[in-house]
Amino acid sequence: MSDRYQICVRCIMDTSDPEIDFDAEGVCSHCRRFEEVGRPVLERVGTPEGKRSLADLVERMKERGQGRDYDCVIGVSGGVDSTYVAYAVKTRGLRPLAVHCDTGWNSELAVKNIENIVTRLDIDLRTFVVDWEEMRDLQLAFFKASLANCDIPQDHAFLAALYRTAASERIPFIVTGSNLATESILPRAWGYNAGDLRHLRAVHRRFGTVPLRRYPTLGFVRRYFYYPVMRGIRTIPILDYLPYRKSDAKRIIREELGWRDYGGKHYESIFTRFFQAYYLPRKFGFDKRRAHLSSLVVSGELTRDEALREMGTPPHPQKELLEDKEYVAKKLGISVGEFERLLALPTRTYRDFPSSVALFGLKDRAVAWYRRRSRLRESGPARAG
């Protein structure tokens, strides 16, 4: 982190991101990347060409789904993005198979939201239950490693469960809730790549105690070669094809599906709520709301002043955060005192452990080159992985 504080003049990202940089006008690297990568995609949404791309995509999914029970796989967590994805695909006549990955941390509200989604939309649901002892040990390993992204064990399992289900059910499309309108900004230092299996295994090898025999994993080659090339599975970020505003999405799913709000982004998980609202700000000085709100600023849903006002409020009530800390410690099988000791350890970064960061960087550059060659406006915003 820089000793000299600076905040972007366009969004609200600042030097709490140790890898941020600013141009001569004070515009940050995240904003510049959004202008290069995100804005062309979002400006295409709703245009005649964009509408045609969406219609063609839906038609292709229906054609590939002929003779099968389902056209696509979707993940459901009870959160806004995944709930709106379920609504969007179902109202367009697609037959999704919903997959929920139960890592042991669902809030009651998340469970109720999922029940409402699948019931009201008449969607089949598969629940993938992760072995708790392995999940607990892996999450503890990340706390012992003193890394910023202690949510990797959950996020990696979610991803692996989607691909496993698509492959086992012979479903050629995974429709995800990742999107540029609300998620274009996330510093790598705050949330290193959950898809990096080499990194996950390196952390567990050093600090874990329970063998990962049933925990679902997804390696680089399997994700970017075996599944898309050998099995023909394509990942579709459908919200990048739609006009997507967080506030409008919440209103629609409340009215149509009986969805109930759970607070902050990804707070449907008790662990993630504690991780984002307590662990990251206290231990690292990272407040992920800054990235989430900056994403809404650059996409035009919020003004910069509105985002700054939101940052002036606590991420979650203090009393509830302390209750969450006790709950997380107890569920992980350690005392609050031992948990406090782990939280007080000197911080490390993902660079302190083996990873495939160079390989993912090469992949990203190859994708960027391909998009430039094929002209993004012709190929649409679909992603390969």
Question: In which residue ranges do the predicted regions lie?
Answer:
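Nucleotide-activated chemistry modules centered on ATP-dependent adenylation/adenylyltransferase
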Residues: M1-C72, A88-G385
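Short flanking/linker segments adjacent to small metal-binding domains or redox-active Cys/His motifs
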Residues: V80-T83, V336
